[in-house]
């Protein structure tokens, strides 16, 4: 009997504790859930596999729209912008840089010029001349949404096809020339050694052409002329190396080259 009573009492105590724990367990998850959702400092909210904040879907959709709206940038084309209406300081700004900065123009004679790399398409722009925004009346204009008059330029790929073709042709010609220089000339080839004949060893050198006998360094300089200046040489005398007669144990070498309309004669003195 004593054991039965003690078991009943201990069972009632355990039943009360179990009921108390069940009651506490029924309300605790709700409170913990409210704290986790309302508090951004609780790190467990990010560890739950099924928990997503309400703005996650909106952020993902916004990011997807942003990625879809990004398009590959078009090729920039060098475009010449010119201002011919005078002024001291001229700048330009337009839709190509979101009107954020003013690009200075360089003065060339009576005009102001700038070369800008603009993508293909239409662009609005305006000049900032001596502190005032103005447009060029000689160029196409358009009225913006704010009612201001801006210049309009249309950059088209077809306008640069000639330059692209010339650039491509230049690259191909340079590659061809390099390939021709590196390759051997056409013709038969063999491994036979050339045998010199006895009469070839004692053959006299070729006769010097008569037009190469008139070396300008051997000519007497006129008294009225500047001794540092030489007479204009004949075109057949260019790009030749001349050795003058040895005098006072000094050998003189000379060569004449032409640069456009100027002639330069170089002298090399070597003691012997």
Curated annotation (Swiss-Prot):
Phosphorylated when associated with the catalytic subunit (PRKAA1 or PRKAA2). Phosphorylated by ULK1 and ULK2; leading to negatively regulate AMPK activity and suggesting the existence of a regulatory feedback loop between ULK1, ULK2 and AMPK. GO terms for biological process: cellular response to nutrient levels; fatty acid biosynthetic process; positive regulation of cold-induced thermogenesis; signal transduction. The keyword Lipid biosynthesis applies. GO terms for molecular function: protein kinase binding. The modification Phosphoserine is found at residues 39, 69, 95, 108, 158, 170, 174, 184. Transmembrane segments: none annotated. Residues 1-52 are annotated as: Disordered. It comes from the Eukaryota. SUPFAM superfamilies: AMPKBI-like (SSF160219), E set domains (SSF81296). Gene3D superfamilies: 6.20.250.60, Immunoglobulins (2.60.40.10). The modification Phosphothreonine is found at residues 40, 148. One of its GO terms (cellular component) is nucleotide-activated protein kinase complex. InterPro entries: AMPK1_CBM, ASC_dom, ASC_dom_sf, CRP1_MDG1_kinase, Ig-like_fold, Ig_E-set. Pfam families: AMPK1_CBM, AMPKBI. AMPK is a heterotrimer of an alpha catalytic subunit (PRKAA1 or PRKAA2), a beta (PRKAB1 or PRKAB2) and a gamma non-catalytic subunits (PRKAG1, PRKAG2 or PRKAG3). Belongs to the 5'-AMP-activated protein kinase beta subunit family. This is 5'-AMP-activated protein kinase subunit beta-2. The lineage of its organism: Eukaryota, Metazoa, Chordata, Craniata, Vertebrata. The gene is PRKAB2.
